[in-house]
């Protein structure tokens, strides 16, 4: 039987078990997908268990960066991004990948979001790094903003991007919220409505709540919008393919996540 899990802290409300249960069932595979609460200090011990008994695991906060030092091999893309979200176990060896970046691009394509720049990524943390890397690899002009300007400058220098003030949002054709704004406080938005562009698309990686203030205001402006669930589903589907060689239906995984969210 195939064993999978998501490791992170906290993971009690993770949507990954619901998505991967759909993937296993839809492809007729016998297996399980667990949620393992794993604080940072518990990571080495957990990975020993993975070496022994699991086909693969997903990693979420706060483990994506720390895991690199504990793996036998890390893909060049994951090394550049500085984060691993998918681990494959083969004969006791652990191989690390990042499916966040390609998952983001696949979600845009599936949702009919034009890959047109300039693209402004709000946030220079782990999610922001993956998104900025993906958009740059797709050939877009990429701008980055962060509440702490030094972090935006560091990311821009590392990836060959441009750190910009928030006011540049008006000139962007693709806006991506890769911050946690809107998660703890649903009434908050990372961007004042008056700074939204006149045309283009907006993506919010926050999916609790699913329709954030940021997305609602963008939709009212007439912009094309996408919630955080398509990227979540696509990164999960690509991880599942790394583990099994089979690609589950991302739209089915997204629907499973919606049901788990209760929306």
From Swiss-Prot:
Q: Summarize where NADP(+) binds, as residue positions.
A: 123-127, 146-151, 205, 228
Q: Which residues of this UniProt protein bind shikimate?
A: 14-16, 60, 85, 100, 207
Top EC group:
oxidoreductase
> What UniProt keywords are attached to this protein's entry?
Amino-acid biosynthesis, Aromatic amino acid biosynthesis, NADP, Oxidoreductase
Q: Name one GO molecular function term.
A: shikimate 3-dehydrogenase (NADP+) activity
| Pfam families registered for this protein in UniProt | SDH_C, Shikimate_DH, Shikimate_dh_N
Statement: the UniProt record of this protein carries the keyword Oxidoreductase:
yes
Q: What GO terms fall under cellular component here?
A: cytosol
Its function, per the record, reads: Involved in the biosynthesis of the chorismate, which leads to the biosynthesis of aromatic amino acids. Catalyzes the reversible NADPH linked reduction of 3-dehydroshikimate (DHSA) to yield shikimate (SA).
Quaternary structure, per UniProt, is:
Homodimer.
Family statement: Belongs to the shikimate dehydrogenase family.
Q: What PANTHER family does the entry give?
A: BIFUNCTIONAL 3-DEHYDROQUINATE DEHYDRATASE_SHIKIMATE DEHYDROGENASE, CHLOROPLASTIC, SHIKIMATE DEHYDROGENASE
Q: What is this protein called?
A: Shikimate dehydrogenase (NADP(+))
């Amino acid at each position: 039987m195939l064993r999978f899990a998501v490791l992170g802290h906290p993971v009690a409300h993770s949507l990954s078990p619901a998505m991967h249960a759909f993937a296993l069932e839809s492809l007729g595979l016998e297996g399980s997908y667990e949620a393992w609460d794993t604080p940072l200090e518990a990571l080495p011990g957990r990975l020993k268990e993975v070496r022994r008994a699991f086909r693969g695991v997903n990693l979420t906060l706060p483990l994506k960066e720390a895991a690199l030092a504990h793996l036998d091999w890390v893909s060049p893309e994951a090394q550049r991004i500085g984060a691993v979200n998918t681990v494959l176990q083969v004969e006791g060896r652990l191989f690390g990948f990042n499916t966040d970046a390609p998952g983001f691009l696949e979600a845009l394509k599936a949702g009919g979001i034009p890959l047109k720049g300039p693209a402004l990524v709000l946030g220079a943390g782990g999610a922001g790094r993956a998104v900025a890397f993906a958009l740059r690899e797709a050939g877009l002009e990429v701008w980055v903003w962060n509440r702490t300007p030094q972090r935006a400058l560091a990311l821009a220098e590392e990836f060959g991007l441009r750190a910009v003030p928030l006011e540049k949002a008006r000139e962007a054709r693709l806006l991506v919220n890769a911050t946690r704004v809107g998660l703890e406080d649903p009434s908050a938005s990372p961007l004042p409505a008056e700074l939204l562009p006149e045309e283009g698309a907006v993506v919010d990686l926050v999916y609790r709540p699913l329709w954030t203030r940021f997305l609602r205001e963008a939709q009212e402006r007439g912009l094309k919008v996408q919630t955080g669930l398509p990227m979540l589903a696509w990164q999960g589907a690509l991880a599942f393919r790394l583990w099994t060689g089979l690609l589950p239906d991302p739209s089915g995984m997204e629907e499973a996540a919606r049901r788990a969210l209760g929306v």
